[in-house]
Design a protein with these regions (language model features):
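Extracytoplasmic
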Residues: 175, 394-567
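Hydrophobic/aromatic-rich transmembrane helices and adjacent perimembrane loops
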Residues: 91, 137-140, 178, 305-317, ...
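Short acidic/glycine- and proline-prone juxtamembrane loop motifs at membrane-interface regions
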Residues: 129-139
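Transmembrane-helix motifs of polytopic, lipid-linked glycan transferases
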Residues: 85-108, 146
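Membrane-interface alpha helices of multi-pass inner-membrane proteins
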Residues: 117-118, 145, 150, 159-174, ...
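Membrane-lumen/periplasm interface segments of specific transmembrane helices
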Residues: 19, 195-238, 242-258, 288-297, ...
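Transmembrane-helix signature of polytopic, membrane-embedded enzymes
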Residues: 101-123, 141-142, 157-161, 223, ...
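Extracytosolic helix-loop segments that constitute the early lumenal/periplasmic catalytic or substrate-binding loops
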Residues: 21, 35-60, 67, 74, ...
């Protein structure tokens, strides 16, 4: 098993590094949000600074503490690509998280189990898509993983270092708390109330630093941090993001988690045979909820929203069973075993709720995936050999499946990257227009170090929840304050082309030929309709500035530059 684990870990790490080698230095934004973070890194040492006054130009919302922007600003000086410094931080942070996961699992289950878990992490979709992007999530996760590892040691100096790592994790991304809470709950279970001094001291220091940030920013940090947590939740979209890739990306891990939670013949266990039987029945119920997803994966004939809902029901069953193991679980030691694994799963599933917030994505599954891998890895060293072998095989399948499927992700194909590179046409056209320029695409300005006047996503969400009415921006548009405006629309396919016999026409690439509907605005990050009308009443399209980007064969994005109408 050791040699197999080494091979799988080598495959996973090599694949991740090869992807990073291609994409870390890529000069264009790969996913929305990178350019906003790039602008934050610029504003560390430039006007208007981080946390500008809300309700005034520039309409920007800085959701997180300043640690990552400062670090990205420093590292970015050594990169020739706009995003290279920030992506390098994220790449190294993701690799560090995998190493720490390996070391944590190694303590209880051996190096082979640790390597399997580390390899599984690097081949999970959320890390393949977000583990190297210029976003705060990978750094926050790596700091939290350092904290978890340090808390496993008894030495005071090591635990102080771990508390510092947790501190910076939270002040990199405020919602990175699941690993922190599980770690201190485990410490409390092992050492009793004396262990509470660690989380309470960390809380006190965190609140003091929060007060310091509020003081030095005249309250702006508080307003920005609170505002970002008031955005609407869209549960249907959240279910889609969380569970549409369950089959085949996460199914082996899901089964492995159940096998890890089902009790074995541990010392002190109450009616172990009955508990095991009940556990397998509950696992069967949860897997039964997911059967529709398996059928949909093999023969896509039903509405994906339906099987996403059933997968959600399966996770509700898992949540209930994990809660039951917390209330009932016993083990040879107070801090390890099934009970703390139940806590890990409850925290993992609770952390997944944030993916329902509008604009959230798979990066909100980072902690959930890590906690599930910790459960599986810990069980390998605890349960009977036959079940430990099955869990190991499931992790190996998870690695091999992710290794194969990652090559099918369309956003990283060469032709997709070539499409992205064409964005330079918009940036080149903007060179003749002086600041200020308004853009619905942050990359059009941030990549050349030009200031953003507005964060499209946060501005739209603030408008939708009634915290910004847009009247000040409309007044600026009426006064033609901006020398140019970059507008963005999208176009989705409306149906498939058919021949005279009613058969779907298949192109040379083997895919059906689509026909497209009209150009529309993005409901999440396009400017509100009344602001769009103000643009059209005061600006006109600049000839020759249209740029259409094919995201997929069935989805297009278009950009245009508009200039003031002569008066």
């Amino acid at each position: 098993m050791f040699l197999v684990a080494v091979l799988l870990a080598s495959l996973a790490a090599s694949q991740f590094l090869m992807r990073c080698w291609t994409l870390v230095g890529f000069p264009q934004e790969i996913r929305y949000g990178e350019a906003v973070v790039l602008d934050q890194a610029r504003r560390v040492m430039a006007e208007p600074g981080l946390y500008p006054e809300m309700g005034k130009e520039p309409w920007l919302l800085d959701q997180y503490a300043p640690f990552y922007p400062f670090l990205a600003h420093i590292v970015g000086k050594f990169s020739s690509s706009p995003y290279g410094g920030g992506r390098a931080i994220s790449m190294l942070a993701t690799l560090l998280s995998a190493v720490m996961l390996t070391l944590i699992v190694r303590r209880s289950s051996g190096i082979a189990a640790g390597l399997l878990c580390g390899a599984a992490m690097l081949t999970m979709m959320e890390f393949l898509r977000f583990g190297f992007l210029m976003r705060v999530d990978p750094l926050a996760l790596s700091l939290a993983m350092i904290g978890v590892w340090c808390n496993l040691h008894q030495k005071t100096s090591v635990r102080i270092f771990g508390a510092a790592a947790f501190f910076f994790a939270v002040y990199t991304r405020q919602t990175t708390v699941a690993l922190l809470l599980v770690s201190y709950i485990q410490m409390w279970r092992q050492e009793g109330r004396v262990a509470l001094r660690w989380p309470l001291s960390l809380l006190a220091v965190g609140l003091l630093f929060y007060g310091f940030l509020v003081l030095v920013t005249d309250g702006a940090f508080h307003h920005h941090a609170v505002m970002s947590n008031l955005f609407h939740f869209e549960w249907a979209e959240g279910l889609k993001k969380a569970f549409s890739s369950f089959m085949p990306w996460r199914a082996p891990l899901f089964i492995g988690v159940f096998l890890a939670l089902i009790p074995g013949p541990e010392p002190g266990a109450i009616r172990p045979r009955r508990a095991r039987t009940a556990g397998f029945l509950v696992m069967g119920l949860a897997l039964g909820c997911c059967v529709q997803a398996l059928i949909q994966f093999a023969v896509p004939i039903s509405d994906p929203a339906v099987h996403n809902k059933w997968i959600c029901y399966g996770h509700v069953v898992l949540f209930a069973y994990a809660t039951w193991t917390i209330l009932r679980g016993t083990s040879a030691t107070r801090g390890d075993g099934i009970r703390i694994d139940g806590v890990r799963i409850v925290m993992a599933l609770a952390s997944m709720i944030l993916i329902g917030r509008i604009g959230s994505d798979l990066n909100y599954l980072f902690e959930a995936g890590i906690l599930m891998l910790l459960v599986c890895g810990g069980a390998i060293g605890r349960v009977a050999p036959p079940r430990a072998l099955i869990i190991s095989l499931l992790l190996a399948i998870q690695v091999l499946g992710g290794f194969y499927l990652s090559g099918l992700q369309l956003e990283f194909q060469p032709e997709r990257l070539l499409e992205m590179k064409e964005r330079h046409r918009i940036i080149d056209h903007l060179e003749v227009y002086p600041d200020p320029v308004l853009s619905e695409e942050p990359w059009a300005l941030a990549q050349t170090g030009r200031p953003l006047m507005l964060g499209p996503y946060t501005a739209r969400q603030m408008y939708d929840i009634g915290l910004w009415d847009g009247k000040d921006l409309i007044a600026a548009l009426d006064a033609q304050r901006y020398s140019a405006i970059v507008r963005a629309k999208q176009r989705s396919y409306a149906g498939l082309e058919h021949d005279v016999n009613g058969n779907v026409i298949i192109a040379a690439d083997g895919l059906p030929i689509p026909y497209f509907g009209p150009w529309t605005f993005n409901s999440v990050r396009s400017l509100p309709l009344e602001i769009q009308q103000a643009i059209e009443g005061n600006y006109q399209q600049a000839p020759g500035t249209t740029m259409i980007e094919r995201v997929t064969k069935y989805y297009l994005e278009g950009r245009e530059i508009w200039v003031p109408i002569p008066r």
